Amino acid sequence: MKALIIDDEPLARNELTYLLNEIGGFEEINEAENVKETLEALLINQYDIIFLDVNLMDENGIELGAKIQKMKEPPAIIFATAHDQYAVQAFELNATDYILKPFGQKRIEQAVNKVRATKAKDDNSANAIVNDMSANFDQSLPVEIDDKIHMLKQQNIIGIGTHNGITTIHTTNHKYETTEPLNRYEKRLNPTYFIRIHRSYIINTKHIKEVQQWFNYTYMVILTNGVKMQVGRSFMKDFKASIGLL
C-alpha cells in the first residue's frame, strides 16, 4: 500500500512514518505539510491511505478531506489529530478512522488493518468482475444464416460491418454474411473487448493491427485480417479511450 501523511508538524509526521514502517507492508510512505504539497503528491501518486491532521497552516483538514473525497478513486482517510471535536464531521466524510494524538502503534495498526480489509474486499470484487467478463468473452455468438446457426467464439471475431442491409462478420478463419442488424450483435458482445467505432462498424480491440490518421481528424483502423474500418467522428472519444490514447 501507499500512504501519505499530511501534517504541518514535522515531529508528528516523523512519528507516524516511524510507526507505519514498524507495522510494515507499505510500498511507499510520503509526507506533506500543506495543501499545495498534498495536491502535488496526489497528482503524482495514487495513495491507498491518507493520514490527515485537522489543523493545517493553510486550510482546515476537514475541508481538505472533503476535496480529496471528490476524487475519482479517493484514498481511505484517517484523521490523526489532537482535537476530538471534529470527529462527527470527519465520519460524515466517510473517514475510515479518527485517531487522537499522541499516537500509539496498536491504535495506528488497528486503523491500517481496517483499510487493508476494505481494500482486500474491493480487490476480490474487482477480480470477480474481470473473471466474469473473461468468461463472457469465451462465450459464443450465435449467427443464423439460411437454415444453419453458426456458433462463433467471440475471441475469434475480428470485426463486424454492415453495408446496404448486409452484415458481414469477419473471423480469424472465415467471413459470414447475414441480414441481421448490427445492433442485435452489439448487445451480445463483450464490451470489454468490442467497441463500436462507426454507425456501421464494430471491432474487437484485440485484433487491431494498426491505426492510421485519416481525413477530418479521424482514424482508419486496420485489423489483423487486413480489413480496414474507419472511425466515425462521433465515436472518436470512446475509441481513443479504448486504445489508451485518453
From Swiss-Prot:
Keyword Transmembrane helix in annotation: no
UniProt keywords, alphabetically: Cytoplasm, DNA-binding, Phosphoprotein, Transcription, Transcription regulation, Two-component regulatory system
Domain annotation Response regulatory: ranges: 2-116
Location(s), subcellular: Cytoplasm
Residues covered by the HTH LytTR-type domain: 141-245
Top-rank taxon: Bacteria
Name under which the protein is recorded: Transcriptional regulatory protein LytR
Species: Staphylococcus aureus (strain bovine RF122 / ET3-1)
Lineage: Bacteria, Bacillati, Bacillota, Bacilli, Bacillales
